[in-house]
């Protein structure tokens, strides 16, 4: 009997070890989650460049009231800002010390051949690749050294203004675009040391629980050479590694990471599929058709429609990338809208393409599998554009 018990114990421990090793080799949560569906409006706020100034046009209180009256409760606060600097923060979220680089030359020289997706292991090739990144991407912006601290302050300010009007609003704050994609993990570490703590500090415990949905990953692609489909933790890709670092922290607080990637032929669309179907790095993935501005992207309307219907990213033949949907990721579509549908030489063509969105994607309104892009406040509150926007929330 004792021998049988020992044998059973051995088998049980071995099975647990195998299970743990198996889990360790995926980018999935420890168990599936059923995520709330949300239908966010994207709102530009704050910095549009390295000046540190709020170059995006501000929303008026009257405009924020109109958004609330239209039934809009979820917002992504975003920026076109591609930052270079950050400042450390104190316990109150205030910047301390001088601005520092998010990714330094020293950081770049720590990147390995595997990080860079190099086939060669030679030191010569690695050094050349590192120095090419520095030449191509390591730029020095204006002397004012605007920081991620300034941008998140603008986002928090707008969120508080919306909350004063709509106490049920929920927000996703931006993790700005990574200027040096190969060094994305360095950006991510500083983002989660500065941006996320500042959000936590800015809101009461009750507000953080109720009104903060999470963060928005602004880098719209999974660039870089490295992408190993056999590595279903992060594919060895710098952008996915960085995003996973952020989402792991968010998931500990029951918060989510949102991604709205652009679609294009070739590896970008394929990568969206593998990331979305096989990992829980991103909790919400709303794919951009791009058709509103690019007539040649019409096929993506059909691809995305089929994917949202299936709840998994499908290839052009209708097959699931990765073979099956393993993740809890919510798959949706971004509706693109701006004043080009009513003004300019190609307004009629833009409106025709916009109507294709209405025809193909309106079915997803009731399940809230839609995010809405409507440019900045200057475009959003042009009369006809506003009416078209609000139709999605009726």
What do the PLM-derived regions correspond to, one by one?
Residues 1-11:
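Bacterial N-terminal signal peptides that target proteins for export
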Residues 10-19:
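Bacterial N-terminal signal peptides
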Residues 28-190:
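N-terminal catalytic cores of secreted or lumenal carbohydrate-active enzymes
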Residues 191-195, 211, 222-242, 247, ...:
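Extracellular glycoside hydrolase catalytic/binding regions
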């Amino acid at each position: 009997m004792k021998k049988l018990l020992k044998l059973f114990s051995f088998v049980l421990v071995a099975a647990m070890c195998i299970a743990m090793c198996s889990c360790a080799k995926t980018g999935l949560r420890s168990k599936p989650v059923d995520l709330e569906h949300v239908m966010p409006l994207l709102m530009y706020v704050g910095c549009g460049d390295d000046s540190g100034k709020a170059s995006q046009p501000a929303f008026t209180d009257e405009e924020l009231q109109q958004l609330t009256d239209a039934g809009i409760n979820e917002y992504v606060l975003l920026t076109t800002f591609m930052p270079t600097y950050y400042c450390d923060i104190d316990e109150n979220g205030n910047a301390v010390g001088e601005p520092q680089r998010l990714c330094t030359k020293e950081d770049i020289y720590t990147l390995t051949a595997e990080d860079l997706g190099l086939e060669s292991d030679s030191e010569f090739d690695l050094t050349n690749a590192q120095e090419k990144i520095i030449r191509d991407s390591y730029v020095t912006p204006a002397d004012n050294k605007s920081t991620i601290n300034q941008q998140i302050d603008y986002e928090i300010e707008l969120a508080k203004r919306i909350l004063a009007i709509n106490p049920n609003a929920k927000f996703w704050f931006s993790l700005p675009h990574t200027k040096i994609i190969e060094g994305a993990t360095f950006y991510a570490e500083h983002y989660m040391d500065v941006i996320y703590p500042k959000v936590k500090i800015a809101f009461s415990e009750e507000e953080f629980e109720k009104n903060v949905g999470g963060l928005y990953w602004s880098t719209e692609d999974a660039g870089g050479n490295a992408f190993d489909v056999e590595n279903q933790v992060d594919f060895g890709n710098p952008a996915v590694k960085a995003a996973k670092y952020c989402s792991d922290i968010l998931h500990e607080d029951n918060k989510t990471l949102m991604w709205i990637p652009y679609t294009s032929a070739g590896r970008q669309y394929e990568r969206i599929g593998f990331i979305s179907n096989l990992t829980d790095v991103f909790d919400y993935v709303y794919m951009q058709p791009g058709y509103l501005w690019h007539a040649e992207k019409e096929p993506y309307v059909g691809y995305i429609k089929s994917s949202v219907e299936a709840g998994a990213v499908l290839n052009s033949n209708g097959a699931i990338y990765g073979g099956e949907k393993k993740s809890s990721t919510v798959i949706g579509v971004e509706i693109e809208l701006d004043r080009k549908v009513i003004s300019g030489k190609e307004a009629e063509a833009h409106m025709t393409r916009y109507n294709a969105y209405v025809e193909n994607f309106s079915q997803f309104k009731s399940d809230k599998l839609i995010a809405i892009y409507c440019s900045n406040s200057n475009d959003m509150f042009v009369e006809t554009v506003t009416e078209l926007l609000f139709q999605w929330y009726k």
